[in-house]
């Protein structure tokens, strides 16, 4: 359950702007603010079942976007490769100038993504 929450939060960060304002707000209330279905229902004026349905449909929409676009997966891959590059750099016998330039480049790549 915890992993699913993290994944949905991650997808919400990437694709949240694609969702309607209402769907995004409900997901943020549920996952980020840790509100119950009843609390969300009271706040936005629909039934608990309506909130649950909206959350499920929004989750499906986020998962579909990731399946088709793969932006989160690509982002994670780039982050991992940048980390591996820096780790390999620390273990190598490269001059300080080269090491600093590569670190600067890796940091700029991270900042860009």
Placement of each model-derived feature along the sequence:
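Short, Lys/Arg-enriched N-terminal segment that forms or immediately precedes the first helix
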Residues: 3-15
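Helix-turn-helix DNA-binding elements, focusing on the entry/boundary residues of the two helices
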Residues: 37
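Hydrophobic positions on the alpha-helical face of helix-turn-helix-like DNA-binding modules
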Residues: 40-41, 51
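Residues within the DNA-recognition helix of helix-turn-helix
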Residues: 54-57
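Helix-turn-helix DNA-binding motif, specifically the short coil turn and the N-cap/start of the second
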Residues: 47-48
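Short amphipathic alpha helix immediately N-terminal
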Residues: 21-32
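C-terminal flanking helix
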Residues: 59-66
């Amino acid at each position: 359950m915890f992993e699913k929450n993290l994944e949905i939060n991650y997808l919400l960060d990437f694709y949240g702007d694609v969702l309607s304002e209402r769907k995004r707000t409900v997901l943020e209330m549920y996952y980020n603010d840790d509100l119950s279905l009843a609390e969300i229902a009271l706040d936005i004026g629909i039934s608990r079942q309506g909130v649950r349905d909206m959350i499920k449909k929004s989750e499906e929409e986020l998962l579909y976007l990731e399946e088709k676009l793969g932006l989160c997966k690509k982002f994670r891959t780039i982050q991992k490769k940048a980390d591996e590059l820096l780790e390999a750099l620390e273990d190598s016998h490269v001059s300080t100038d080269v090491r600093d330039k590569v670190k600067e480049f890796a940091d700029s790549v991270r900042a860009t993504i």
